[in-house]
A protein has these predicted regions:
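Acidic, low-complexity terminal tails and accessory targeting/binding regions
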Residues: 21-39, 93-103, 115-199
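Short, conserved phosphate/pyrophosphate- and ester-handling motifs at nucleotide-, phospho-/glycolipid
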Residues: 109
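Internal catalytic-core helix/loop-beta-alpha segment
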Residues: 60-93
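Alpha-helical structural signal in soluble globular domains
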Residues: 3-7, 81, 119
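Short glycine/proline- and acidic residue-enriched helix-loop micro-motifs
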Residues: 40-73, 182-186
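Phosphate-coordination/substrate-recognition cap region in phosphate-metabolizing enzymes
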Residues: 1-58, 199
């Protein structure tokens, strides 16, 4: 965020809950702690609860660990942020007596971003974490819709936009992707990152 803030002569507020999603669970194959967006498909796709935004953290994969606590922290943090703009969550929508076309810009990592989007759109983060990829420096845009006075919902306009890199003829990172075809290595990150503890 610093580069953008310096270039645009703006300041920002750091929101502790908006740090990368810190929830961890225990991988049933290895017994090691694992981030929830890094499970192999065969380990989670047969779990119906993981598709349910209201109950996904109750699944056996997350009964041990901190995923549920961090999910609730994320929801509370997002709702508190939106409350500053007059929005109060009610079920899956927000009540707002005076909705404004303000722009809120959040700089964050993939895991927490998808958790926030899941909360706003009513989608289990497991589906977003394992079905979407947003590379570093990409832009994701959500807008509000108020079709009934005082009832606000969110819609994703774009996810992972990299047009600023294309326009500047800059390459994009493949971080966060897994190999398109099997390679024997479960990552597209540079092999030297393994020794640095990035995996």
């Amino acid at each position: 965020a610093r580069y953008t803030l310096e270039r645009t002569h703006r300041t920002a507020e750091t929101l502790p809950w908006l740090a990368e999603f810190r929830g961890r669970s225990i991988d049933p194959e290895t017994g090691a702690e694992r981030i929830p967006w890094d499970y192999k498909p065969r380990l989670w796709q047969g779990h119906p609860l993981l598709y349910d935004v209201n109950h996904w953290t109750e699944d056996e994969l997350f009964r041990v660990g901190t995923v549920d606590a961090i999910w609730h922290e994320t929801q509370a943090g997002m709702d508190a942020l939106l409350a500053r703009y007059g929005m109060t969550r009610e079920g899956h929508l927000y009540r707002c007596e005076n909705n404004q076309p303000d722009t809120i810009v959040l700089f964050c990592h993939f895991g927490i971003m998808m958790a926030c989007i899941g909360h706003l759109l009513g989608v289990s983060p497991m589906l977003l974490w394992h079905g979407f990829c947003t590379q570093p420096s990409s832009v994701t845009t959500l807008v509000t819709e108020e079709r009934v006075k005082g009832e606000v919902v969110f819609r994703c306009m774009q996810s992972g936009d990299l047009s600023h890199l294309y326009a500047a003829d800059e390459p994009y990172s493949t971080a966060a992707l897994f190999p398109e075809c099997y390679t024997g290595r479960d990552s597209t990150d540079p092999p030297e990152w393994d020794a640095l503890g990035y995996r």
